[in-house]
Amino acid sequence: MSNRPNNNPGGSLRRSQRNTAGAQPQDDSIGGRSCSSSSAVIVPQPEDPDRANTSERQKTGQVPKKDNSRGVKRSASPDYNRTNSPSSAKKPRAFQHIESLSETNKPPSKSKKRHLDQEQQLKSAQLPSTSKAHTRKSVAAGSSRSQKRKRTESSCVKSGSGSESTGAEERSAKPTKLASKSATSAKAGCSTITDSSSAASTSSSSSAVASASSTVPAGARVKQGKDQNKARRSRSASSPSPRRSSREKEQSKTGGSSKFDWAARFSPKVSLPKTKLSLPGSSKSETSKPGPSGLQAKLASLRKSTKKRSESPPAELPSLRRSTRQKTTGSCASTSRRGSGLGKRGAAEARRQEKMADPEGNQETVNSSAARTDEAPQGAAASSSVAGAVGMTTSGESESDDSEMGRLQALLEARGLPPHLFGPLGPRMSQLFHRTIGSGASSKAQQLLQGLQASDESQQLQAVIEMCQLLVMGNEETLGGFPVKSVVPALITLLQMEHNFDIMNHACRALTYMMEALPRSSAVVVDAIPVFLEKLQVIQCIDVAEQALTALEMLSRRHSKAILQAGGLADCLLYLEFFSINAQRNALAIAANCCQSITPDEFHFVADSLPLLTQRLTHQDKKSVESTCLCFARLVDNFQHEENLLQQVASKDLLTNVQQLLVVTPPILSSGMFIMVVRMFSLMCSNCPTLAVQLMKQNIAETLHFLLCGASNGSCQEQIDLVPRSPQELYELTSLICELMPCLPKEGIFAVDTMLKKGNAQNTDGAIWQWRDDRGLWHPYNRIDSRIIEAAHQVGEDEISLSTLGRVYTIDFNSMQQINEDTGTARAIQRKPNPLANTNTSGYSDLKKDDARAQLMKEDPELAKSFIKTLFGVLYEVYSSSAGPAVRHKCLRAILRIIYFADAELLKDVLKNHAVSSHIASMLSSQDLKIVVGALQMAEILMQKLPDIFSVYFRREGVMHQVKHLAESESLLTSPPKACTNGSGSLGSTTPASSGTATAATNASADLGSPSLQHSRDDSLDLSPQGRLSDVLKRKRLPKRGPRRPKYSPPRDDDKVDNQAKSPTTTQSPKSSFLASLNPKTWGRLSAQSNSNNIEPARTAGVSGLARAASKDTISNNREKIKGWIKEQAHKFVERYFSSENMDGSNPALNVLQRLCAATEQLNLQVDGGAECLVEIRSIVSESDVSSFEIQHSGFVKQLLLYLTSKSEKDAVSREIRLKRFLHVFFSSPLPGEEPVGRVEPVGHAPLLALVHKMNNCLSQMEQFPVKVHDFPSGNGSGGSFSLNRGSQALKFFNTHQLKCQLQRHPDCANVKQWKGGPVKIDPLALVQAIERYLVVRGYGRVREDDEDSDDDGSDEEIDESLAAQFLNSGNVRHRLQFYIGEHLLPYNMTVYQAVRQFSVQAEDERESTDDESNPLGRAGIWTKTHTIWYKPVREDEESSKDCVGGKRGRAQTAPTKTSPRNAKKHDELWHDGVCPSVANPLEVYLIPTPPENITFEDPSLDVILLLRVLHAISRYWYYLYDNAMCKEIIPTSEFINSKLTAKANRQLQDPLVIMTGNIPTWLTELGKTCPFFFPFDTRQMLFYVTAFDRDRAMQRLLDTNPEINQSDSQDSRVAPRLDRKKRTVNREELLKQAESVMQDLGSSRAMLEIQYENEVGTGLGPTLEFYALVSQELQRADLGLWRGEEVTLSNPKGSQEGTKYIQNLQGLFALPFGRTAKPAHIAKVKMKFRFLGKLMAKAIMDFRLVDLPLGLPFYKWMLRQETSLTSHDLFDIDPVVARSVYHLEDIVRQKKRLEQDKSQTKESLQYALETLTMNGCSVEDLGLDFTLPGFPNIELKKGGKDIPVTIHNLEEYLRLVIFWALNEGVCRQFDSFRDGFESVFPLSHLQYFYPEELDQLLCGSKADTWDAKTLMECCRPDHGYTHDSRAVKFLFEILSSFDNEQQRLFLQFVTGSPRLPVGGFRSLNPPLTIVRKTFESTENPDDFLPSVMTCVNYLKLPDYSSIEIMRDKLLIAAREGQQSFHLS
């Protein structure tokens, strides 16, 4: 579709201006999050980047305020709320006729038949929607009406130029695609063409013109465009949005693209007369696809000339949800806004032009909190005259239809449109025509309105009841043109009829339903607030009062200010206790909304209600309590600087009640609310120290200890185990602890903190910014937003983009307006000086003389002491176990305060259990300057207070070493080369450091403040814009001042210049840019290179944040100053405390290092030093407190590693002997050569355990693994964004930016089409396979024969429906194209962003200067350059071998299976000679001194990691060194877990951004596979889901484990994964057979499998879980012959299970062996079943389902390819009886060997001795054994084995063969098939994260365990009639905790569908088990009924039984009888 000329010569100035922006090709966009969309993924790009950028803003169009005058100046905006029409003389004739019809208001009865015919026609016209399909249709249809056309044409033309234009336009709009969402503006009276998608969006409904409703939300405009884009682009794929009507869906399907081509093709012929009208809103009229571009202008002028006719609805109003942006999910995410081709800059221009268009400059200003929450613009008349609906208002008489269509066609034909076009268009036009005029809702409303205004009450009642019905069934589509303005006053009048309760109640309901169906009507309903409140002040009828509360609650979401100022808060709470619980919730929700932006002047409105609200906190109802908490949190937030108000708020028991609320178990507060409440406490303490003192006296320390550690049992000093909490919760809790302590001083050693906090003292608190609502009231922005705006204002920005609460606003400083990006709503803003600003802006308060906290420390030392003792250890533990910098910085501040204010004695007591010194040492080696400064301050305080103790420890732990290093280092803190930080302008640097790295929070630049929302006096006011990271992404940055030419310092190379010219020169400032904070190193570098006084306006895709003109000098100066301070302080420290080295030797503790060094030297491999040196090491490790620093510096680690692993010729002693010596010393195993005859058993492992712990401490201190987290600390409570999701900003970034790619055919191939579409824009998170899908369905995947045409087939955009369907439906599409960037072949399941970042040439150029690990968004260049992606067809030979991942996997390439040797020769050896391969020793793999191949990372701790890996292997496999050892680990694997690495891994895996981009750090995946023992099972399970499967599954897993991630910004719907689901119905009678076919079809599909049973209504999670459980059971049937074990029948058989035998093996199932002579047919059948089992298990893992198969350990070893190391120990796990006999016989073999080695024996005595060797008194020969497998006489162990007896001489061979056949040879074929099946779903190599014994948990869930009542209480949720205190709930928990294993399984299967719980038990059940009350009629007895369940949501519906016995019986009956059926309960 090419750019079209402006064919509207009469267009106004604004139109021609806009044409440049408008005329551009249509964007398609790749949004490939989901495989479900076949075409909606790529955006062909206009070549001109400037023009391309105009895409996003043309959604604006301001709506002036209500104004009923009709003066000349308002001519551009006719008042659509009037019902009188202009005189008919002024109308063209055609319209007089139509109007007369309309006014009769007849129902459309006559046209019904025609309507149906036309729908039939429409259906017949549907073709696969290819862009050209419709234009090729038969031409005939159009010609039949030509006579009529000519007639009408002449009559129209007579009307002269003005009316002709209107008439022409009236019809011209018809052939356009009447937008699937009708004209927004009409109903709103707001008439703007809003989306480029087409002017059709404006021309879709007949009566919009006549609409009286005035309240379009600006959002609706966006929606229109979005839906059209979707309809146009993703016809074959994307499912229609939920709220679109079915007719509309049809429309969008059939109307897809055909209607656009003719417009494009024929528009040049159209030349319409000039129109006088200017179109302020028609942002893109020229290029709108559906019709000749001039037609829209006509439409508008038509609308103007015909002004008002009678009310009649537009066909459909765009469905407006609360947030109009929520639709941007999934694969079309990018189409919704970008796809339209509208740019933000264009929108800005549109806004400016609109200002010109409206002479009075009226702007619509929206009421109250709409800016912060849901946008609800309500202006009355529109600022532009294109109302967007066709001006037809007839009721649809059939006679007029033909003539209308005819006239329309005639007119268009006369304008040069060929008649054949009307063939395909005719039926559709008339169908749309019918829809627009046939809807009777509006006319019905008019009739009812008359009824409401009647004088007769019965008539009024009837009318109001019908009005309720109309509204409750309606939505925005069906209620188009509803006369809100007239209906509301009429309803308000009825509401005041005090004597008639019925009428009042229904009137109240009608208003509520109206706000639900038409959200914008709330602006008009606001007038009813006083009347609603009247109903609450004097309650005459409780129903009316409750209904009024419901209405007020809806109003309060947008108009809380109006309610507050009408005194509504107190009125709503007046009779709170009288209402039902739902009404109470509403009342409290209103209160919370009223507090949202309350100002100190309005405090009197709430003051009286505070006691009541405080008391409400003790209530049991969760929702009420949360609303009340929200209320207080908002009050505290808004009054945080008003100390006296804070005290009033907290006066009435508030602190006590909240404190109790925090510790209630089970918790009432959700995670987000918990964070908010704790934050509220912090704010109170920080700003009002007296409240802090009050809390201390109320024993807040115990509360905090409980919240962090759970209930303490005994001494809290010993072992501190933290309760698992999210980083955000930890952050707020540590903040609170920090605020409870007095502030630190700001002089002396703490003076540097001022530098850390404030870069330059720019004061952003100096002013308050406010915006004005509809009523002219001013509302303040919340604190953070206000700071962002002020910061931008101070540096002279023209405008900034502010993203808050899911909306994006442009703040325009020139016009002082705030403009909503989505909707174009504009509001006035103003700046007011902040009276409070000067009280305390320095960021540090002077220690006030009356800081009550400091006073308390002096006056009540006991209280202070207990506080510090209770919390110091906990803080310390939080610091050690947190990876996020925000939490660590906050902990550090709190610890510093405690250490500073505690006296020496207390400190000694508190610190004695903590290795403070080694922590300080590792902090000093951190790369984060903030941490280094804190560590130096701490060291200084400790040396001042406890010099004797710490002078020794600081030496031993390496503190002194590090401080000296800091004092001497020239280039301070230069990090390892990989992490160079110079010039980054960031202190919270991102280099690998113990503190974790680049957090989006670290403020890169002079504001070195922590990301955290510091609330304290000393920290609090540093809430710089990034306090909430500001969400600032700016587009246009033309600073008002300063030259416009960039001057760069000499760049490093040409590429840099190029990069800088195109990319933002993000000069950073104290308040820093968004991306700089994400990766200071990368983005900061640009700032260091550009001269700050001459800033080029950065224009790229929003990559720069608040780019500020802060001089380079200030930034680097500040950093340099801090570095200088560190160096100077370190120097002073050494001088003061360690200058005299005379202390050496004076303290015995200092000798440890010497001893260790001496022992280490003796671990020499060349000289045999015996075991003495090991004994010395053992004593040092286990008896002295050797420090990590000493271990590091003695060379011990490296030497021990070599000692245990080296295998060189030169070694004096062999490795095996060294290992045995080591085991002897550390584990008391026998020395080499002294093994006993009996079993070698583990004795004492304490020394080895001590060594492991010491090594783990070393690892924790040395490792510097980077963590890519994006700590986005929360905003404040007032905006409700209290848990603003970390990572969501960056996700937003990905949602709003696309990569520019050029698709090119690979030079190597010429047999596929060449892409001619120019550059495309691709969603960065789309997968590479989305590009393939996009190209293949357009025919680019077809390989041409040589003789076919080359590239001129011109059918680029033709979509092959069959291929599209194939892509949609099949999980296993054959790949047709492969893609390259440069030489690199791209994996299909890689995101495009990852591919570009990893392989693009630019990426390679940049990598030298970028620390790739830590930068999630890549360099600016990634977003500005065009990346070339080559495609070529997949070669046949490659296809078969390719391991295609991402759900389209073929068989993965894996190592050849090492089962019994495959080739014939070896087979012969086994069969003929009985020679079997020797058992592999698993230890060998680990005993290497160098890193294994799959460890590629570098880290200072690498040697320690390798040593721990060796120690773990020795502990796990030591028994392979002895031939008679007990098979048992020395040390449990759990002892090897490293808490610091675990914290880092967990933190990393909780970050949505990292998971979405697949950007997991390499160290984590590599350690996870090579050293899984460092991490607990659940961490590895999460890591497995993140790395093994697609991104959506990883996100789903993340959301299941951390539900709070999705609690914030709902518009970030991209966080929500889009997992396809495939549903299959199966028959219970043939379950196994059907399961096999389901797995055959869908096993390898990426879609989630859902199962339903024939003739049962249940569907969803429960039946699916039961399917896996039942199939597992079917596979255990004895008749299948799959397993070893005994046959049993089920204890509680159902249906077909009766009489069926099943296999049971208490040790676990293992495959039944085959002999050499087994029948091939039988083998094939069994192999098929095993292949199916492999698929089933892999699919279960992939879909988070559980199977119920009790498999044995050897089975899992086979899965992990460990079959070569199976020994007789493993035999015990499949057949204990045989295994015991084998053990006895092995003992005989060992005795025989001893005898043979005994030199003293003669031949005769040896013979005699051998004959006396017996087993239970029998000689071997007497046992009567032959060479067959025990238990399987038909399986021979070697050829002719039946006839070979076992004797003492061949006993050893016999035992080897038995073990080999039972565990390997006999079962290898089954396991090969199993592995094949498994790998067809995903590669088995991904299971390397687990040990064999853990796979059972992964597959089958948690082990059977008794359930205790306490756990049940914490994990189960009573609801709907029950609470934790209900009798029935207590009964239930008591019963469940008494269940045995079988009863547990029955109960679980009944309630959840699966007999097993996931790992973690009830705690991990998702959704949680919910117990609800089953209700009955009053006449019924609950004891007569059984409980029922909803398995999909784990609901147990439990009657309230009279006794525990009855409940127990009923539960067991239900559980037994309720199996295997899903019917309605």
UniProtKB/Swiss-Prot annotation:
The modification N-acetylserine is found at S2. It catalyses: S-ubiquitinyl-[E2 ubiquitin-conjugating enzyme]-L-cysteine + [acceptor protein]-L-lysine = [E2 ubiquitin-conjugating enzyme]-L-cysteine + N(6)-ubiquitinyl-[acceptor protein]-L-lysine. One of its GO terms (molecular function) is ubiquitin protein ligase activity. This is E3 ubiquitin-protein ligase TRIP12. Residues 1-10, 18-27, 78-88, 99-108, 119-132, 280-290, 326-338, 362-371 have a biased composition (Polar residues). Pathway: Protein modification; protein ubiquitination. Its main location: nucleus. PROSITE patterns: HECT, WWE. It holds the Pfam family HECT. Residues 48-70, 346-358, 1050-1059 have a biased composition (Basic and acidic residues). Keywords: Acetylation, DNA damage, DNA repair, Nucleus, Phosphoprotein, Transferase, Ubl conjugation pathway. Residues 755-869 form the WWE domain. Disulfide bonds: none annotated. The modification Phosphoserine is found at residues 12, 77, 85, 100, 310, 312, 975, 1024, 1030, 1049, 1063, 1350, 1355, 1362, 1409, 1460. Signal peptide: none annotated.
